[in-house]
């Protein structure tokens, strides 16, 4: 018989309380125990003399008191967008950086990126602010400003050395994500983009739980044409549906290559099962568009420059503009207001 994974008692409780765990007791619960999750745990008369008293008294109980604080901090953020993909290496962080630069081309729009890829933060490098450090004031942490209307917050800014590994378990990751939402002075933003790691792990559960009170507009899925990528994106779509996160659409990255010499398009990563468009139709979600491969995107990210400013007429830039306009429609916005024509 094949092994099976243990199913949680309530999936809804997993989404609602991603970091609330039953304390690890050192002895069985006595007959008159009020319960380790009770508000009186460790304090009731029946707790006297119990080996678990100190453990139960220090365990978190009830609703997270920081949720209202987060909602108040983000009350002036108009749109909160998650960028997700079940698969690593599909260009999700690259997509986030391109999307931020696209939104920021409108000088009237203020944009923020929150990098929740705790163990592999690459957004600072792509935005050209890798060597910056966070300033802490009496009112909170100041994000790093890439330009007048584009800010970034990442764990990379908190590391003593650029190459330091972040070897953290879930609770520490969750705590930092909460700080990014609760303590960072995001100010008035039109768009807050949340770059996430691959999969459906602690980071995703925490972001969803912490932002429930202030509202998430939805998630953008990023994939490449291969079925290996699509398999994991299906799981990510299922995660969003179970978590109650609206799926704003799916974008296919690295979709073909347009030769700069002859303009002929080649399918380097040819779709074997229909690619992103077919998956969007299968899962009944909007298809935002396809962005072709362009080595200059990699170059712009390596040098921390805006691909939109450097290569505005390239096939990939024009395709990405279409993705942005389709996303604007899903947000209920006028595409001309989000990405004005020159």
UniProtKB/Swiss-Prot annotation:
It is found in: Cytoplasm. Its main location: cytoplasm. Binds 4 [4Fe-4S] clusters per heterotetramer. Contains two stable clusters in the N-termini of NBP35 and two labile, bridging clusters between subunits of the NBP35-CFD1 heterotetramer. ATP binds at residues 86-93. GO terms for cellular component: cytosol. Keywords: 4Fe-4S, ATP-binding, Cytoplasm, Iron, Iron-sulfur, Metal-binding, Nucleotide-binding. Its cofactor is [4Fe-4S] cluster. Gene3D superfamilies: P-loop containing nucleotide triphosphate hydrolases. GO terms for biological process: iron-sulfur cluster assembly. GO terms for molecular function: 4 iron, 4 sulfur cluster binding; ATP binding; ATP-dependent FeS chaperone activity; metal ion binding. [4Fe-4S] cluster 2 binds at residues 259, 262. It comes from the Eukaryota. InterPro entries: Mrp-like_CS (IPR000808), Mrp/NBP35_ATP-bd (IPR019591), NUBP1/Nbp35 (IPR028601), P-loop_NTPase (IPR027417), YlxH/NBP35 (IPR033756). [4Fe-4S] cluster 1 binds at residues 33, 47, 50, 56. Component of the cytosolic iron-sulfur (Fe/S) protein assembly (CIA) machinery. Required for maturation of extramitochondrial Fe-S proteins. The NBP35-CFD1 heterotetramer forms a Fe-S scaffold complex, mediating the de novo assembly of an Fe-S cluster and its transfer to target apoproteins. HAMAP family: Mrp_NBP35, NUBP1. Heterotetramer of 2 NBP35 and 2 CFD1 chains. Belongs to the Mrp/NBP35 ATP-binding proteins family. NUBP1/NBP35 subfamily. This is Cytosolic Fe-S cluster assembly factor NBP35. It comes from Gibberella zeae (strain ATCC MYA-4620 / CBS 123657 / FGSC 9075 / NRRL 31084 / PH-1).
